[in-house]
Every structure is written in structure tokens, then in C-alpha cells.
């Protein structure tokens, strides 16, 4: 009895519906497919009780029991059976080769969508092993699947015997477990592979030709074997015994039918089954998601490894249930969890045989042991449409499976069930086991409205973790081929390490003396490679077998940082292509192709190349004239000094003695050695004070004592890039006429560099004694060569009014002074007013006495230069930072005391006596774009005009003119305070440029674009960003502020407008006078910083 609480099965619902008769024009409905046993019994008009009939009844008995007049379709069955008995070759005029290609006719208006059919699999050579194609059950229906923790079918069925009735009395309405098929194996013989049942409604809707074409591939094998010798029939039966037949019916039943106990006709079973029909059982299994295995045996070997049979018990004590009779199927479904074996199986999986019956070991169907098995021609599960919320469907089993790899090659691989451990489907949730269908893993609730259909694919991905997929097989073949190629000169040890590195060819460090590209010694690799030239490296690589290694780039590899390569190779890191090609050609044992012509002497190119380099090295230390090396281009002035040092050190190391160089090369090497020993700039420590008589390390005497000469001054720290005529102390021409500038003449206002006066000029202080720090890099350096009175007597210059002295330093004394020779007296504005005319031009010395008379600090004891252009090229002021004394040449006051001037001296004749040609480093230093930009944002007229001929630049402030004049002579006195920075040597001509540069070292970018958020260190960089293509949108949405008249703002105006501080709080940068070299230790005033910022 069925449980009243349990939902009715799918078949029970359709069994209560009235039988619908199909017309001649429509296809059969689902009621014809669910043709119940009760209706079949009533249609036969039999008064006998409804019992299962044995299969040994003859066809004639069935015909007598049937009444053909009650169903018009019986005549079609009789005609079909008569056609089969006529010889099986031709059925109703159609040949056997007319195989079925499509599924049964389907009517979308009447037939149910739950029926899933699949086209028949392609036959091998058209037919099967015995001349027939495979049955549809072997194609569609998947393996046995069980649900864990569910009771199995309690009823069991013994094998059918000859003349015995079945003890099975399960009626259609008494199905207890809808999860399992209620149809038990009726025990067809090993040769009965035909269709056992055909719905009656189907035959009524098909003509004879269609029926014969669809039935022909599934005929009984026994009929086809009639007329053959008994030995051949027995041989065919034995061939079928060792295959998949025993997987579905069990070994005992198969042996019984093989001995003749269970011989039956498939068509007889189809017409005479009184209980639940096989087709209904197969239909119920199709619409379920458990994919029970088909009852029909297969004629082909299984492509999958054997799987162990679980819970094997002797057949003599307990009859095999349907689950135990089918230990494995042709294609395991990914939904089905395999049962773990309790006992170790033998090499061949067999069922426990009955007493006295021989056992037939199952044929090995593993692709590893049976290479002839069809490995890629079977689908892994049949397609099916699944409605998860159907009451007859069981729960979806989502437990993943794993393979046990500890078994042997021919031993069964037991598949253990593991909860939630990987797999292709979500892990099972024990809390959702009471739900039906896909409720456990479906995003739609079980009772939700709408369709819930799950399509089970015909070929799901499976076996990925078991190594039986297509991709795994390809990987195994590729790995085997790669391992075979590695066996050879590399040896087994290296091959093992290669496999351990997952295919990467990483040799052991002990196998070669040279570092390789993928070796771990990456740091010292470039250093080790410097000992050999390129050809020697290629030859060494060839000895190690690197020519055959196609996975690496031949040649040395070194870190990219130049500092890691201490000394470059003597060949200047050159790459010889011919030597490289010769190395590659020598590594290949094969001769060159016949169509490639070898150049004469091509093989000896590397040897010749190496001999040439060796001869060049040997010639460095020899005394022959022909072996003297030519001048290395890298030793010429203007080249990078580090390369010359490296070359000279390399020559010294290789030859053991200093190379014989010409005086110019030796002179440059001495300069570079002195540069290496220079003092680093330290802004945290005050500069030391030297007593009189000591040599300051920043003076030119210090460098002259080391053999350095002034023309290398641009490469020395603390000096300026001044011309030779203004920085030379030695090798100066003898006394001659006094050279003086002619810039102050009334007729011409030129900026001219004075000529040299005396070679023996020595610095003397008016206070007596040597000046402690009056060398290069100190204020006042170079003043004696700028004085126009160097060759004059005391009486000639006694009455000259030398201007005023300043009590405060100029704001740019911090990095070397103003360069104007301004004394310690009045302010810079007063001085500029005294030397500048109304039109902005510089006044001649004859007219400056009247303009200087109003100076509040004017004194007869003060001495200054008569022209502002006298010491523009110098780096310092005329006065020291700690002494009011001024240095003047000894020739001015040869042993005479200081005499205060009484009357002004008219020196205009000095400028008319001698005029020298203009000598400036650069005549034009301002670009057109800079001049236009400066003029466009200028609010006042430029009253300060550059005196250099051809320049014509004007400025509104005096310190802008001073910086501009430094640019003419390529002076850059303002150095970056960060060691290692190129600007620490090159410097800047303007102090605000230097401060703005040092903001980059501190990571401060004060000018930010409000549109995109980019930051810039300079306002002009922000302006260029707005003019670029990327910043056009920013310029439209967030334009830069302008002045009231529409002119663009300068940096100082922009900072004031935005409230930007030049030195943000917390930056820790202290620009004091100590850092600038003044030594006073006082912070610079806020006024001077802001004034220099413009």
C-alpha cells in the first residue's frame, strides 16, 4: 500500500486519466506511453487473475488469448511478427540498412514535454558486432544512481526460470519509493537486446514503412541468429558475456541465460508483459534525475576504469537487488555518489557466483590497459529535461566524488564520496535534504511560481581530477615527449630538477662555472662577466652546451644599474655580431644548409676578434711607437668624467704601471682625481675658519697644489663656470698694458670683459697679511683683475670717489655674492639709483660722482669699483663677510699707506685710451617665448636694460638684471644642497630657481591643478598643462587666476593669491646663511626670501 502522506507518483496521476484514443493523423499522447497493466489486461479480455507470466510461453498461446477484434492495432503487430519470422532480412519491403535516424514523432500539442529522447549514436561501420545497431536504452539511459540514507526497494526478484512464474506481485499502484524504478529486471538473455515493448498508440499513428524503419535497428538477436551453426551462435553469446551485459543483469542471471535457462524472445516479451511494462519503467527513469542504468547490455567495451562493487554478498544467501546487480555502468553520472567498498576487490570485479557455476571475469575496459577501447566516442550521460519540483523526482545529490589513486593499474578505482570537497556542483546541504528536486541548489524557492526546468547535458565535464579527460591525456603526452627530449647530455639529475621546476630549465649551480640567465646569482653576475670579452664568453658558453639551449638569450646578463658594473669591459660593452653568429654556428653540430654560402674565414672571426683586442691591450704597456694607443674619444674634454677615470684605472690594473699618456690626457686625469677627493657640501656644519697663512680648501691655491689647472673649474665643487680669462691664476702672460672695460664711456655702453694685467699679482689686504679665504668660491674672488686701476700709481687713483660701502650684505651673498662689487654701506636700491640714468641705462664713471653724493654712508675711506660691470663675472663681493677690509692688488699701493682721496679723479680718458673687443660667453640668453611671456605679464615699464650688445632685455627689478647678467657669462653660483644631484655641480644663475629646484627633492609641488589634481613645482609647468591636450578641460572648468588687467600672475602673485607658503610647516628645511656659505648662522630675512622669489 502506498503511504497516504506521500505525494502520488507521476504514473499514478496519469493512470487515473481516461484512455485517449489517437486518431490516424495525430501522434500518440502520453496516455499511450503510460499504458497501464490493468488496461492491457482488460483489453485482452482475460478472466484470469492479473499475474506475471513467465517468458517461456509461446507466441501461439498469446495469440489464442488475445482477441484481435477488440483492437485494430493487433493486426499490425501480427504483421510485424510475421515479417520478423520470414527471415529478418527484409521487413515489409524495407531493408535492414534503413536505420532510424530521428526520435519518435512528437506532437507539441498533445505529447508531454517531460519525454526526453536522444538521437541514436553513430554506429561503427553502420552495424554492431552481431550485425545490428545498439538499442536505444544503451544510448539514452545512464548509470545506476542511489540516494544516501534512503531505504532501498524491499522487494527482490529471483532469476526467471524455465516454466516458473515470477514471485513478484508489485502492482502499478503499490509503488512505495518514487525515487527508484519499480520495474525489476525481467532477466532478458544475453542475446536479447531488442525493444521489449512498443506502445499501442504509437503503432496506430504510423504506417508500415515508418514502423519498419524505426523498429529495424532494435530487433531480437536470436531471430537474426537463426540459421547459423550452433557453434557460431555459442561464440557470439560468449563474446557478449564478457562485456557490459553482466553490469545490468548480474553474473548469475547472465550465466543462467547463457546455459539456456533464460532464452526468450524480445518481441514476445514486448507483447505479453502483463505487469508494469518495461517502456514505462524506462520512461519513469528518463523523467527522473537519478539516471538508472538501462536493462540492455552493450556490445562495446567500457572506456572508463573499473569501479568496485559495493556490499558484495553471496547470491546463495541473499538475492541480488537491483542496485547490487549493477555495480558499474557504461557512463557514470556526475550526480551519482559512488559507494565505498568495504572489502578489497580483486583485479577483476565480479559478482559472487552461484554454487557450481563458472565465473567470467569482466573484460578490462580501462583506456590505460585497453588501448583499443573507444576513448572519445561515447557521451557520458544521456540528455534529459528535469522539472525539479515534480513530486516524483528525488533529491538532487550534490556530493562530489574523488578518485583513489592508491590502486594498481588493473585494480578497481574506488570512488569515495566526500561531502562538499570540490567537484562541479555545489556541496550538499544536509538541512535541505527534505526538499525535492533542485530546491537545495536552485535560486528559485520550491513553491515559487513559474517554470523550474533543469537540463541535464548529454556530455557533462567529468574526470578532471581523475586524469581521464582529453586535456589530461594531452598533458601526459606532452610531458612524456618533453621528458624524452631532455634525456641526453643534461643527465638524469638535471632532468629531475627540471621536472621539479614545472618544466622550466633551471640547472644546478654546480653544473657550470658561468652564471646563467635564470640562475639565482643575479647580483654578482655582471661583475663576473667583466673579466672576459665577448668572444671569450661565447666560447665558454659553447663548452657548457648553451648553444643548444633555445630557452635563454645567449650572452651575459647583468643588472641594469650602472653602479653595479664597477668597471666596464675594455671593448666599451660593444657587441660583435659576427662573433655571436660564429658562436651560434659552432654550437650546432649539423652542417649548414647547402644553399647557404659560408664566407671565407667566417669560422675564425671570433679568434681574430679576440686577438685584436689582446693586441690592443698589450700595446698599452709597450714602448714601441706603433703600439701607442690613440686618443680615446671618451678622454676628450666634454665627455663624462667617470668614463675616463674608469678607463685609466683599467689600464693601470691590466699593465701594472701608469699608461704613457700625452700631457693633455695626464692633465685631465689629475683633474679628475682631484675631483674625486673634493669636500662634500654639508649644510649642517658651519664652515671652518682658517688662520692667516693657511690654505682654504675652497681656494684656487689648494687646487694648484694638487696639480689642477683652472680650465677644469666647471667640474670642481665651489667654483663657477667662468671663462678662462677670469678664473686663471697661473700661466698668465707677462705685464702689459692695462686692460679695462669701456662700458662706461658716453658714446658706447658695452659689457666687455677686461683683459689680464699682471702675472705676479698677489692678493693683499689693506689691513696687512694674507687674506684667509679669498680663493675661488669666496666673496671678492677675481676683483683684482677687474680693477681699472691695476697698473696706475697711487696718485692717479687717490682722488677717485669709490662710492659707498654697505653695512648689510646683499641678499644674494648667501651663495657667492652679488657679483657687482658692492661694498658694505648703503642699500642696493640706492646703489642702483646712483649708477643708473633716467632712461634705465648705466651711467659712465665720470657722471656717477654727482649721483653718489647723496649716499648717506658715503665715505672717503671706502673703496669700490668704478663700474658695475667690472666684476660681474666674479663670484664674490669685494669684501669678506667678517672683515671690513677690502683686498686690492699690491701694485696699486706698493708700500704706501692708505691715503684718503681729496678730489675726484677724472678717469674718462682711461676709457678713451684703450678699448678692447667685447668678450662674453653668450650674446643672447633670453628666448623669444620667455621675453614675450615676461612682457605680457609686466605691470611696470622695464627700467633696467641689459648692457650686452644685441640683447636688449629689460627688467623691472635690479636683481632680475643681475641674474640675467650671470647668464651671459654662463655663471651658475647657486648650487643644489643635495649631494649627488647634477645641479649641485652645475648650479643655477638665479637663487629662486635653485630654491624651486630643491622643492623637488623634498617632494613639494606647490602648484596644483584644481581640475585633475595634478601637482607641479612651477607655475609655468601648470600653465603648460592647461595649454596641453590633456589639460584643456581643466583650463575651461578651472582657469588660472589673472590680474585685474587680465595679465597672467607671476609665481609670487599666485602664491599670495592662493596663500601658498614657500616653506610649508613641518618640512624641516632651514635655508640659513650657514648653508649658503656665509657662516653667520643667522636666518635669512623674510623680506630677502620673498624678493628673490620673483
Swiss-Prot record:
Spans through the membrane: none
Domain of life of the native organism: Eukaryota
Keyword set, alphabetical order: Activator, Cytoplasm, DNA-binding, Metal-binding, Nucleus, Phosphoprotein, Repeat, Transcription, Transcription regulation, Virulence, Zinc, Zinc-finger
Residues that bear Phosphoserine: 103, 288, 329, 508, 569, 765, 810
GO function terms (MF aspect): DNA-binding transcription activator activity, RNA polymerase II-specific; RNA polymerase II cis-regulatory region sequence-specific DNA binding; zinc ion binding
Pfam family, one: zf-C2H2
Protein localization: Cytoplasm, Cytosol; Nucleus
Record's compositionally biased regions (Basic and acidic residues): 60-78, 94-103
GO CC annotations, alphabetized: chromatin; cytosol; nucleus
Protein name according to UniProt: Transcriptional regulator CRZ1
Name of the encoding gene: CRZ1
Amino acid at each position: 500500500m502506498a503511504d497516504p502522506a506521500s505525494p502520488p507518483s507521476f504514473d499514478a496521476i496519469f493512470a487515473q486519466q481516461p484512455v485517449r484514443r489517437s486518431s490516424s493523423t495525430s501522434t500518440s499522447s502520453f496516455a499511450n506511453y503510460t499504458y497501464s497493466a490493468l488496461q492491457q489486461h482488460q483489453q485482452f479480455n482475460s478472466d484470469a487473475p492479473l499475474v506475471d507470466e513467465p517468458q517461456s510461453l509461446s507466441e501461439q498461446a498469446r495469440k489464442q488469448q488475445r482477441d484481435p477484434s477488440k483492437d485494430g492495432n493487433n493486426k499490425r503487430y501480427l504483421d510485424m511478427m510475421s515479417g520478423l519470422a520470414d527471415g529478418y532480412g527484409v521487413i515489409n519491403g524495407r531493408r535492414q540498412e534503413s536505420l532510424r535516424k530521428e526520435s519518435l514523432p512528437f506532437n507539441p500539442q498533445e505529447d508531454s514535454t517531460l519525454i526526453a529522447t536522444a538521437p541514436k549514436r553513430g554506429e561503427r561501420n553502420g552495424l554492431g558486432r552481431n550485425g545490428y545497431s545498439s538499442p536505444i536504452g544503451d544510448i539514452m539511459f545512464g548509470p545506476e544512481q542511489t540516494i544516501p540514507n534512503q531505504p532501498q526497494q524491499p522487494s527482490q526478484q529471483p532469476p526467471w526460470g524455465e516454466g516458473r512464474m515470477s514471485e513478484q506481485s508489485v502492482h502499478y499502484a503499490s509503488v512505495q519509493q518514487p525515487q527508484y524504478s519499480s520495474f525489476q529486471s525481467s532477466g532478458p538473455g544475453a542475446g536479447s537486446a531488442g525493444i521489449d515493448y512498443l506502445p499501442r498508440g504509437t503503432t496506430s499513428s504510423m504506417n508500415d514503412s515508418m514502423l519498419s524503419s524505426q523498429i529495424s535497428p532494435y530487433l531480437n538477436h536470436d531471430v537474426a541468429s537463426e540459421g547459423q551453426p550452433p557453434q557460431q551462435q555459442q561464440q557470439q553469446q560468449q563474446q557478449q558475456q564478457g562485456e557490459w551485459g553482466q553490469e545490468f543483469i548480474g553474473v548469475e542471471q547472465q550465466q543462467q541465460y547463457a546455459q539456456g535457462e533464460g532464452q526468450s524472445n524480445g518481441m514476445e516479451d514486448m507483447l505479453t508483459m502483463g505487469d508494469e511494462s518495461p517502456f514505462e519503467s524506462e520512461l519513469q527513469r528518463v523523467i527522473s534525475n537519478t539516471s538508472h542504468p538501462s536493462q540492455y547490455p552493450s556490445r562495446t567495451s567500457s572506456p572508463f576504469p573499473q569501479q568496485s562493487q559495493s556490499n558484495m554478498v553471496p547470491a546463495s544467501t541473499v538475492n541480488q537487488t537491483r542496485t547490487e546487480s549493477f555495480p558499474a555502468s557504461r557512463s557514470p553520472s556526475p550526480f551519482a555518489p559512488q559507494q565505498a567498498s568495504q572489502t578489497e576487490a580483486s583485479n577483476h570485479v565480479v559478482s559472487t557466483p552461484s554454487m557450481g557455476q563458472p565465473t567470467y571475469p569482466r573484460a578490462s575496459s580501462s583506456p590505460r590497459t585497453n588501448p583499443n577501447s573507444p576513448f572519445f566516442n561515447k557521451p557520458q550521460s544521456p540528455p534529459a529535461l528535469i522539472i525539479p519540483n515534480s513530486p516524483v523526482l528525488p533529491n538532487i545529490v550534490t556530493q562530489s566524488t574523488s578518485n583513489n589513486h592508491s590502486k594498481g593499474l588493473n585494480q578497481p578505482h574506488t570512488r569515495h564520496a566526500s561531502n562538499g570537497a570540490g567537484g562541479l556542483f555545489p556541496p550538499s546541504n544536509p538541512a535541505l535534504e527534505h526538499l525535492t528536486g533542485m530546491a537545495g541548489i536552485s535560486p528559485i524557492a520550491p513553491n515559487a511560481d513559474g517554470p523550474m526546468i533543469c537540463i541535464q547535458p548529454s556530455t557533462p565535464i567529468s574526470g578532471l581530477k581523475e586524469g581521464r579527460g582529453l586535456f589530461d591525456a594531452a598533458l601526459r603526452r606532452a610531458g612524456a615527449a618533453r621528458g624524452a627530449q631532455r634525456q641526453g647530455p643534461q643527465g638524469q639529475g638535471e632532468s629531475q630538477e627540471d621536472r621539479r621546476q614545472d618544466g622550466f630549465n633551471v640547472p644546478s649551480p654546480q653544473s657550470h662555472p658561468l652564471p646563467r640567465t635564470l640562475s639565482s646569482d643575479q647580483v654578482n653576475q655582471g661583475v663576473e662577466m667583466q673579466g672576459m670579452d665577448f668572444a671569450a664568453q661565447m666560447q665558454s658558453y659553447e663548452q657548457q652546451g648553451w648553444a643548444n639551449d633555445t630557452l635563454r638569450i645567449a650572452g651575459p646578463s647583468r643588472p641594469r644599474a650602472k653602479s653595479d658594473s664597477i668597471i666596464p669591459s675594455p671593448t666599451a660593452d660593444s657587441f660583435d655580431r659576427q662573433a655571436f653568429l660564429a658562436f651560434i654556428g659552432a654550437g650546432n653540430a649539423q652542417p649548414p644548409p647547402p644553399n647557404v654560402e659560408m664566407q671565407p674565414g667566417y669560422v675564425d672571426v671570433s679568434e681574430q676578434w679576440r686577438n685584436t683586442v689582446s693586441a690592443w691591450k698589450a700595446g698599452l704597456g709597450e714602448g714601441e711607437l706603433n703600439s701607442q694607443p690613440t686618443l680615446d674619444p671618451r678622454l676628450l674634454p666634454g665627455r663624462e668624467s667617470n668614463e675616463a677615470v674608469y678607463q685609466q684605472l683599467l689600464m693601470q690594473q691590466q699593465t701594472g704601471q701608469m699608461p704613457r699618456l700625452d700631457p693633455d690626457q695626464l692633465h685631465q686625469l689629475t683633474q679628475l682625481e682631484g675631483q674625486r677627493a673634493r669636500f662634500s657640501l654639508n649644510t649642517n656644519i658651519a664652515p671652518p675658519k682658517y688662520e692667516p697663512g693657511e690654505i682654504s680648501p675652497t681656494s684656487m691655491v689648494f687646487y694648484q697644489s694638487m696639480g689642477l689647472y683652472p680650465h677644469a673649474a666647471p667640474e670642481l665643487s665651489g667654483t663657477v663656470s667662468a671663462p678662462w680669462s677670469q678664473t686663471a691664476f697661473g700661466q698668465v702672460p707677462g705685464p702689459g698694458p692695462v686692460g679695462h672695460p669701456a662700458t662706461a664711456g658716453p658714446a658706447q655702453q658695452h659689457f666687455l670683459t677686461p683683459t689680464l694685467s699682471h702675472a705676479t699679482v698677489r692678493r693683499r689686504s689693506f689691513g696687512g697679511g694674507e687674506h684667509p679665504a679669498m680663493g675661488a668660491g669666496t666673496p671678492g674672488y677675481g676683483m683684482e683683475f677687474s680693477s681699472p686701476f691695476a697698473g696706475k700709481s697711487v696718485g692717479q687713483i687717490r682722488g677717485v670717489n669709490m662710492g659707498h660701502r654697505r653695512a648689510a650684505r646683499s641678499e644674494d651673498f648667501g651663495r657667492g655674492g652679488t657679483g657687482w662689487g658692492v661694498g658694505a654701506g648703503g642699500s642696493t636700491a640706492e646703489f642702483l639709483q646712483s649708477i643708473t640714468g633716467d632712461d634705465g641705462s648705466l651711467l659712465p664713471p665720470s657722471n656717477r660722482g654727482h649721483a653718489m653724493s647723496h649716499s648717506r654712508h658715503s665715505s672717503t675711506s671706502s673703496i669700490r669699483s668704478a663700474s658695475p660691470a667690472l666684476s660681474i663675472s666674479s663670484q664674490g663681493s669685494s669684501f669678506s663677510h667678517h672683515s671690513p677690509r677690502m683686498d686690492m692688488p699690491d701694485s696699486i699701493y706698493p708700500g704706501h699707506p692708505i691715503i684718503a682721496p681729496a678730489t675726484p679723479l677724472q678717469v674718462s680718458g682711461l676709457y678713451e685710451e684703450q678699448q678692447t673687443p667685447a668678450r662674453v660667453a653668450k650674446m643672447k640668453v633670453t628666448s623669444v617665448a620667455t621675453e614675450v611671456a615676461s612682457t605680457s605679464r609686466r605691470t611696470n615699464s622695464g627700467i633696467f636694460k641689459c648692457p650686452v650688445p644685441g640683447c636688449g632685455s629689460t627688467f623691472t627689478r635690479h636683481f632680475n638684471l643681475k641674474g640675467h647678467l650671470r647668464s651671459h657669462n654662463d655663471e651658475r653660483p647657486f648650487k643644489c644642497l643635495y649631494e649627488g644631484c647634477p645641479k649641485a655641480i652645475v648650479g643655477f644663475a638665479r637663487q629662486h630657481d635653485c630654491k624651486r629646484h630643491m622643492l623637488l627633492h623634498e617632494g613639494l609641488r606647490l602648484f596644483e591643478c584644481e581640475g585633475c589634481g595634478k601637482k607641479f613645482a612651477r607655475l609655468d609647468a601648470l600653465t603648460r598643462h592647461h595649454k596641453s591636450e590633456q589639460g584643456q578641460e581643466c583650463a575651461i572648468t578651472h582657469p588660472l587666476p589673472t590680474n585685474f588687467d587680465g595679465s597672467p600672475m607671476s609665481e609670487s602673485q599666485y602664491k599670495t593669491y592662493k596663500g601658498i607658503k614657500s616653506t610649508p610647516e613641518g618640512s624641516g628645511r632651514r635655508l640659513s646663511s650657514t648653508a649658503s656659505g656665509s657662516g653667520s648662522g643667522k636666518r635669512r630675512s623674510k623680506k630677502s626670501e620673498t624678493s628673490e622669489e620673483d
